[in-house]
Amino acid sequence: TLLLNNALFELYSFLRSSDKIGACGGNLYDEDNKPTTSFSRKYPSFFWELLSIMYISPISLSHPRSIFFNVSNKPIRVASIVGADLMVRKSVLSQVGAFAPEFFMNYEETELCHRIHKAKFDIYSVPLAKITHLEGRASYIKQSRLYFLYEGQYIYFRKVYGIFGCRLIFAITQLKSYIRILQFLLLGSPERRSYWKMKLETNRKVWNSEKIKRILK
């Protein structure tokens, strides 16, 4: 992570501007200085996952130019900030707690932001803070990273929606993979079909892991 300007000062100043602000983050750019995912406008849910199966994203309809990046040149309220530039008020951390130790790589900032919102604090995207996030932008997620992505997803849904919610999101995720495998078989795209088969197998492997079995008890 590299600072493109006085980003820390911009975030710190904004955080101190109101006691109602619990956390904030800036705009992230990739290594080619192109905008990349900086925040999320909604929290993960069964509804959004089901819509994604049909390639439907209501957020992209309401915010076609700024789904995950702030192009407004002014602070906007969001659901969660990417962990690479998440700044949280110390008193808020004392109240809601820090990152949950169950997470390894993914969803830990999402779950923390969810707790911050439940405590009645706002979270903002501050575009004046500009930061380079040195992370790969490959179209296909590597299997090793995908494993921890699924693991984080199940831990998040277990914490937020309970055991039933965790089982339901597994079923939806598997359904999506089966549909994509059939879709790309019919479209004659063996590479994409193999990728989704890998996702299906990785998801099943995560679900059957000892860590996930423990959180389902």
Predicted feature locations:
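Short, flexible, basic/aromatic active-site loop/helix in glycosyltransferases
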Residues: 43-79
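A short, conserved alpha-helix in the catalytic core of glycosyltransferases
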Residues: 71-73, 77-98, 102-130
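Generic structural signal for small/hydrophobic residues in well-ordered secondary structure
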Residues: 24-26, 33, 89, 116, ...
